Regions:
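Short, surface-exposed polybasic-aromatic patches that bind anionic ligands, especially phosphate groups
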Residues: 1-408
């Protein structure tokens, strides 16, 4: 309204005061929201209705090119904190890439190895006494894991648990493997043996475990380190493996990291002073909406604590708003399609607003996105655990908007 700045939404001959433009957009999903200026006099005799405005939603939503694409979630002593922005300034977030980490979920005795390259967490099975620190070059570090919140640990999907296994765990170990593919069956190979595939220069390209009389299992350097009482391995040229189609064994992880990743994990070093302590962080970049990139990094603890309270830490024009555990750049937000990662499940579409809430887009998200100026192709497909870092807020859908003001 000219002269006053008041805003109204017209519906069915009634003017409704507008608490936020977002709700008004959702109330006109088909026609798109149009704005006109009018004088107070011209609106004098038009009936007034209830104020419209879903609670805890942004006044307006960002255009597609202002949607956030960078996430950083750090686990600190006080709990995890997540920063979301179109860009995270390197000066304010001085992160350093980590190879791996030894962690323990808060409130649990379970320990995990988190590997950056694999992007997974691996349960360390301590129920078997043979799993000594020496097996994977932990030395004594397994006794000093970094305690993290379960929600933060859930950002890393689970891999095959790490546990030692023995020659005697293999059924029929030592028996001839007479049905192996190709010429391998004529080499006197027995079940339980490790076969190395070597190139013309004598370099080992792949290793396999003979799991039964006809099948091989992929066998990497970590599997070799965890294999107890193994018989001597045999080497064969690459051409002898051309008919091999590896299978899986329940006690050997084909997703295990290489043994080199275990040499220098991040761990809890209580001898560090406050100035040198770091925190573990997970990083996500959704520039490619279909294939986000993930990373494991560390950041100085002092800076992480400062950034969790610093309203200007993202250098955003409006200044971000903060809630319990998230800082979202003001005027931005993240449009997400949350998935379980397992396939066969429809994505859940949500919007993370600069108020620090995760808003469902309702039962028909395409209609909600259309009303707000977005399309499904602009939503980043990310694991559900990332969305669940953010506390839920009001649903942002035409149905929720109409219900909030009693408009049918």
């Amino acid at each position: 309204m000219k002269g006053t700045g008041a805003r109204y939404f017209w519906a069915n001959g009634v003017l409704h005061p507008i608490a936020n433009v977002t709700t008004a957009r959702l109330l006109s999903p088909d026609s798109k929201l149009t704005t006109v200026q009018a004088s107070a006099a011209s609106l004098e005799n038009i009936p007034r209705g209830a104020q419209i405005g879903l609670p805890d939603v942004p006044d307006d939503v960002p255009l597609p090119d202002m949607l956030s694409k960078q996430w950083l979630s750090c686990d600190m002593e006080s709990g995890y904190h997540t920063w979301i922005a179109k860009d995270l300034p390197a000066d304010n977030f001085p992160v350093k890439q980590a190879t791996s980490a030894l962690v323990q979920a808060s409130g649990s005795g379970d320990k995990y190895f988190v590997d950056r390259k694999k992007g997974k967490k691996y349960y360390i099975d301590s129920s078997v006494s043979r799993l000594g620190d020496w097996a994977l070059s932990f030395q004594n570090l397994a006794s000093y894991p970094i305690t993290v919140e379960p929600e933060w640990l859930d950002l890393f999907p689970s891999g095959t648990p790490l546990r030692p296994w023995s020659y005697n765990d293999i059924e029929n170990a030592g028996q001839p493997a007479t049905n192996l593919p190709g010429d391998l069956k004529n080499e006197g190979i027995t079940i339980g043996m490790v076969l190395d595939q070597v190139d013309s220069a004598g370099q080992v390209k792949n290793s396999y475990l003979v799991i039964d009389d006809s099948n091989l299992v992929v066998f990497n350097s970590t599997a070799a380190r965890l294999y107890q009482d193994a018989p001597p391995s045999k080497k064969f040229p690459t051409e002898m493996f051309k008919y091999v189609e590896p299978v899986r064994a329940v006690f050997v992880g084909d997703d295990w990291p290489d043994v080199e990743d275990f040499e220098a994990p991040e761990w809890f070093d209580e001898s560090r002073d406050a100035a040198s302590r770091t925190v573990l962080c997970a990083k996500m970049d959704t520039t490619d909406h279909a294939k986000p990139q993930f990373d494991l990094v560390t950041m100085p603890e002092k800076r992480a604590i400062e950034a969790s309270y610093d309203a200007e830490s993202l250098q955003s024009p409006k200044g971000p708003s903060t809630t319990r555990n998230v800082t979202v750049a003001g005027g931005s937000g993240a449009l997400l399609a949350l998935t379980s990662g397992g396939g066969g499940e429809a994505a859940s579409y949500v919007f993370v607003s600069d108020l620090g809430f995760r808003h469902s887009l309702g039962d028909v998200p395409a209609v909600s996105m259309n009303a707000l100026g977005w399309s499904a192709s602009e939503a980043a497909s990310v694991p559900r655990a990332w969305g669940e870092l953010i506390q839920p807020g009001s649903e942002m859908s035409p149905k929720a908007a109409a219900t909030s003001v009693g408009i049918k």
